[in-house]
Regions:
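Cross-family detector of peptidyl-prolyl cis-trans isomerase
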Residues: 1-118
């Protein structure tokens, strides 16, 4: 992967450029996503996917409703775009992990698609 790494430590790569507007703080982002654990430099176990449920996920951008890596990684996307996010623990679930599915200090890999902004 030819990823761009930001000052915070988030890495991302656009797999399909969007053509619509980028979301603004407070707007609702409607997404499809799949998340995997990143283990030993490779995609590990899948832990969640909106595609598997057949229902997009939505959240207000920049309001702390999702992990920091999502708020940062989605902010510069455009509607219709697809992006791979590689999220270090400090921008993910950190030392606490999540729900017995994501271990403490896990690096996460997400494939996300910005479907709509409202």
């Amino acid at each position: 992967m030819a990823m761009t790494t930001t000052a915070s430590g988030l890495s991302y790569e656009d797999t399909r450029a969007g053509t619509g507007a980028s979301p603004q703080q407070g707007q609702t982002c409607v997404m499809h996503y799949t998340g995997w654990l990143w283990e030993n430099g490779a995609k590990g176990a899948k832990f969640d996917s909106s595609l598997d449920r057949g229902k997009p996920f939505n959240f207000p951008l920049g309001q702390g409703r999702v992990i920091k890596g999502w708020d940062e990684g989605v902010a510069s996307m455009q509607i219709g775009g697809q992006r791979t996010l590689l999220i270090p623990p400090k921008l993910g679930y950190g030392e606490r992990g999540a729900g017995g599915v994501i271990p403490p200090n896990a690096t996460l890999l997400f494939e996300v698609e910005l479907l709509e902004v409202r």
